[in-house]
A protein has these predicted regions:
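Short, small/polar-rich motifs associated with maturation and membrane association
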Residues: 1-236, 243, 248-250, 256, ...
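Membrane-embedded beta-strands of outer-membrane beta-barrel proteins
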Residues: 41, 97, 201, 237, ...
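Surface-exposed loop/interface segments of Gram-negative outer-membrane beta-barrel transport/assembly proteins
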Residues: 106-182, 193, 223-230, 234-319, ...
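Transmembrane beta-strand segments that form the barrel wall of outer-membrane beta-barrel proteins
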Residues: 216-222, 469-478, 519
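Solvent-exposed loop/turn segments connecting transmembrane beta-strands
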Residues: 224-227, 479-485
Length: 544
């Protein structure tokens, strides 16, 4: 029951809701950065050396699981075996996740609000040495254990021992002792608890012929590291109308706008493990530097590293579907739908300015203020995709025999475009735009596309709701493969026996017992758009 699941788990993403709730479905977060789509999903293990992620279908069309607001979902199904996935042909090798979004409830106008406010901080802080005198003594002991000379002099150890007695005293440089002779816990210096919030409101209703649902949500996640905030506004509009008794038309529109700060927090745990206590993170508008000249020159200010780039990534996404359902004679139903989605992203990034300062010596140790070396990069990407589906369905009942059949056609096209430019040499540090940068140093762009077409069909049979059979067949073509290997046939068969429906089990403690046998053939098109056109390149060795 998805509604019960979503209310019982305070997950912020749809993928997070699925963690640990379906046998054989493995969900893990590969990045802790706010706004990151870093999620790994595997159904029954890794199925390929290429992309092993399952296919996600949202209201009948391929989508991205975390593009859907969890509050807009009505149900989620996970298809795992080959017989169930074969109807998706060369996209179903790694399993399929089916998502159906909410529609209006009949008979009344309804407004629903869902909100969440959460306090967030790292679940666990690593124990680090924050007392610098202790750090120096341990480093000396480590060197002695391998027969090497001391790393730090006793004079420096004694100096830090003396200054830590009066942390609020003033050093000769004029700065407080706790700044000039610091003892920094880098876990506490980097991570800052914050408040996460998400609010969703929806309105739905219906008349005799029209059903509608509208929703909007807002999410603000400041993260636990500075300069990593992400905000996101999502929207959805579902509409259907029974024009006549035999004709239904409708549309589904959803999308979002997100704004993500670009903190460089990749490898943050590795950097924190190398942090030394003798660098004060930030004071009086300056980043600290190593206050002990005996300290390794490879030591860095971790706070500056995480803030060394400034910028944002603004993304707009929209997904629109129009559909028509027609009831024809002889229990035949015709369905046609067209889906178009687009995604635009604009990323602007440049290094930050600032001095690395020695507070004990009252001098600039290293300067990051050279405007001539400061660069600005713009990266813009656009993805457009359309998909068309049409099906004919028939179902009939003859005594205890239930038979249904479906045949369909699908066409798909995707186009990716990207453009990037870099200019170097800021005229001033006020305007962070291309007009304020002097020299163009890099311009690049690319465009790729991908097309697919398919015909497919399904026949199901049931006798007395006890003996079941299903046959699927799909014929797929994909531009990602060479011309002679472009098309593939993907059949499947399954048979089932509801043993609990037999007379000899009725009235017993067995409520539901089913035996199922299935076989299927699947394909995988999760490769590059032009991998079959690979060419030779210089600088590589070939075995011929």
């Amino acid at each position: 029951d998805y509604e019960e699941l979503s209310q019982s788990r305070p997950a912020t993403t749809t993928s997070g809701l699925l963690q640990g709730v379906s046998a054989g479905l493995y969900v893990s977060q590969t990045s802790g950065k706010p706004g990151s789509e870093g999620v790994s999903m595997r159904i029954r293990g890794v199925g390929t050396l290429n992309d092993a992620a399952p296919l996600v279908i949202v209201d009948g069309f391929e989508g991205t699981i975390n593009n859907v607001n969890p509050q807009d979902i009505a149900s989620i199904s996970v298809l795992k075996d080959a017989a169930s996935c074969a109807i998706y042909g060369n996209r179903g090798a790694n399993g399929v996740i089916l998502i159906t979004t909410k529609t209006a409830k009949e008979g009344r106008f309804n407004i629903e609000y869902t909100g969440m406010v959460a306090y967030q901080e790292p679940e666990h802080y690593f124990d680090v040495i924050s007392n610098y005198a202790d750090y120096m003594e341990i480093m000396n002991e480590s060197a002695w254990n391998v027969g090497k000379a001391n790393v730090f002099s006793q004079t420096m150890i004694d100096l830090w021992r003396e200054k830590e007695k009066t942390p609020n005293g003033i050093a000769d440089s004029g700065y407080p002792n706790y700044v000039a002779y610091p003892n920094v816990d880098w876990m506490e210096a980097i991570f800052t608890p914050s408040v996460y919030q998400k609010h969703s409101i929806s309105a739905s209703g219906s008349t005799e012929r029209i059903k509608y649902l509208m929703s909007v949500s807002y999410m603000d996640n400041p993260g636990v590291i500075d300069n990593s905030t992400v905000t996101r506004t999502s929207y959805r509009f579902n509409l259907s109308s029974d024009v006549t008794e035999w004709l239904e038309v409708g549309a589904r529109i959803y999308g979002y706008r997100s704004d993500t700060e670009l903190a460089d927090i990749s490898g943050s745990m590795t950097l924190l493990s190398r942090g030394v206590p003798c660098i004060y993170p930030y004071y009086d508008g300056k980043y600290g530097w190593m206050e002990n000249p005996e300290q390794s020159s490879e030591s860095r200010n971790n706070l500056y590293f995480f803030n060394r780039y400034k910028g944002s990534n603004i993304t707009h996404y929209n997904n629109t579907t129009a559909f028509v359902n027609v009831k024809l004679p002889w229990n035949i139903r015709y369905h046609a739908s067209f889906n178009y989605s687009w995604r635009d992203a604009l990323q602007k990034q440049h290094p930050t300015l600032g001095d690395a300062y020695s507070f004990s010596r009252d001098e600039v140790a290293y300067s990051y203020n050279d405007l001539s070396k400061l660069y600005l990069t713009y990266t813009q990407t656009h993805t457009g995709r359309w998909e068309f589906q049409t099906t004919l369905d028939w179902a009939g009942t003859y005594g205890k025999h239930d038979i249904s059949a479906m045949a369909g056609f699908e066409a798909y096209y995707l186009n990716d475009q990207s453009f990037a430019s870099t200019k170097t040499g800021f005229e001033n540090n006020v305007l962070e735009e291309m007009d304020n940068v002097l020299e163009a140093t890099s311009i690049s762009g690319s465009q790729t596309d991908y097309a697919a077409a398919s015909v497919f069909g399904r026949v199901t049979y049931s006798y007395a709701d006890k003996y079941l059979a299903e046959v699927n067949l799909r014929y797929d073509g994909s531009s990602r493969f060479a011309r002679q290997s472009r098309w593939g046939l993907f059949p499947s068969f399954s048979a089932g026996w509801r043993i609990s429906q037999e007379d000899f089990l009725k009235g017993t403690w067995v409520d539901n017992l089913k035996l199922r046998l299935s076989w299927g053939k699947l394909g995988n098109n999760s490769i590059g758009n032009y991998d079959y056109l690979s060419t030779y390149a210089s600088g590589y060795s070939y075995p011929f």
